[in-house]
């Protein structure tokens, strides 16, 4: 099954997440199909917290990809910010 989920990056105690489309059988930070955005929970000042390519997210969801609970909330927040 194809999922849209967070892949952790960044340094120790400084998380940074790529939002990726991946096969659910692959490791969390392993191989992915496409990177559709990022989430920076510790953004400071003018740094972006969230960037998502909503067109690509819609494409993958229409093709059967399931977003994880956290990513679904981030997608909802991104839609609200652009509207």
From Swiss-Prot:
Entry keyword Hydrolase: no
| Record-linked InterPro entries | Ribosomal_bS16, Ribosomal_bS16_CS, Ribosomal_bS16_dom_sf
Family (UniProt):
Belongs to the bacterial ribosomal protein bS16 family.
Does the record's keyword annotation contain Glycoprotein?
Answer: no
Protein name as catalogued = Small ribosomal subunit protein bS16
The alphabetical list of record keywords is:
Ribonucleoprotein, Ribosomal protein
Which domain of life does the protein's organism represent?
Bacteria
Q: Name one GO cellular component term.
A: small ribosomal subunit
Q: What is the lineage of its organism?
A: Bacteria, Pseudomonadati, Pseudomonadota, Gammaproteobacteria, Alteromonadales
| A molecular function GO annotation | structural constituent of ribosome
Gene3D superfamilies in the record, alphabetically?
3.30.1320.10
Instruction: Give me any GO biological process, just one.
Output: translation
């Amino acid at each position: 099954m194809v999922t849209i989920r967070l892949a952790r990056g960044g340094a120790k105690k400084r998380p940074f997440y790529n939002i990726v489309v991946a096969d659910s059988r692959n490791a969390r930070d392993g191989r992915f199909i496409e990177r559709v955005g990022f989430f920076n929970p510790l953004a400071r000042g003018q740094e972006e917290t969230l960037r998502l390519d909503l067109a690509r997210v819609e494409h993958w969801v229409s093709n059967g990809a399931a977003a994880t609970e956290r990513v679904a909330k981030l997608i909802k927040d991104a839609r609200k910010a652009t509207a």
